[in-house]
Structure formats: structure tokens, C-alpha cells
From Swiss-Prot:
One of its GO terms (cellular component) is extracellular space. The gene is CCL2. Belongs to the intercrine beta (chemokine CC) family. Monomer or homodimer; in equilibrium. Is tethered on endothelial cells by glycosaminoglycan (GAG) side chains of proteoglycans. Interacts with TNFAIP6 (via Link domain). Glycans are attached at N37. This is C-C motif chemokine 2. The modification Pyrrolidone carboxylic acid is found at Q24. It comes from Pongo abelii.
Amino acid sequence: MKVSAALLCLLLIAATFSPQGLAQPDAINAPVTCCYNFTNRKISVQRLASYRRITSSKCPKEAVIFKTIVAKEICADPKQKWVQDSMDHLDKQTQTLKT
């Protein structure tokens, strides 16, 4: 009986100090893409295929990553008007394709 109680205590202690990474969902451990520099040039909407927003707290800046029709990814500042206009254009294009 003493052996099983000691074993139970040992298991509880081991569980308390075990790494929490094993209990986290896969998305938390997924790599994060961050933008450290933004393009200085406006990109023509005809060259853009899609975009995604980067809002992770692990990144130093919020950003938009545009993907061009030749699969190149370009970081842009979401505060700039041309970036917002390009996102709106791509959103409308996507909605048109869905309907």
C-alpha cells in the first residue's frame, strides 16, 4: 500500500512539473510569419492574387502580406491607403467569384 501511495505521489509531482507544451493545441506551436520591413512601392492590383493579415502578438508590427500571381509574398503596411484599397479590391474579387 505504501508503494502505491508513493508511486501516486511521484506521478502527481511529475505531472505538475511536466512541460505544458504537450497539452497545447497544434496551432499555438505553429510557426509565425512576421514582417520586419514593408515595401516602399505600390503594387498594381492586377499583379495581386491574395493577401493575409499578420496580427500575431509574436510579431513586432501588424502587416499585410500580399501574394502575387507569380507566388511572391510582399509585406505591406496596413495603414497605407493603397494597401487598404488593394485589400478591398481583392475582397470584392473573391466575393464575385463566390456568387
